[in-house]
């Protein structure tokens, strides 16, 4: 007796996983709206720094002033004590190694402008910007169907 199990081809399996990932992503985005709410930095008026630091790169983004970086990073580090050092904050942003904490200090001091990707990551983490959803322009197979290309 032979038992046969019909499985979808690898491209169809990948599409199933893609759909599952999209559904999980939608749930995660909705769940982000339930994050705890925190007030603004006491005695700090972020409005005087304009809004260009909140824009996307293709909309005319400009690096934020170091005073704003210090204030917002400082508040974040006070609220989330697991990131209370520059090294820990650097690791959160994917800056690993001995220079990560030094780079955070350089952003805070104005010695070095903060890169867009790190700043955008921070804005999303703090609910100051929404995550960008990249549109899928096409779903391309990774393997030939039925042995044909």
Predicted regions: what they are:
Residues 24, 32-39, 75-82, 110, ...:
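Surface-exposed polar/charged interaction patches
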Residues 42-82:
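A short, Lys/Arg-rich alpha-helix, primarily the initiator
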Residues 86-87:
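Helix-turn-helix DNA-binding elements, focusing on the entry/boundary residues of the two helices
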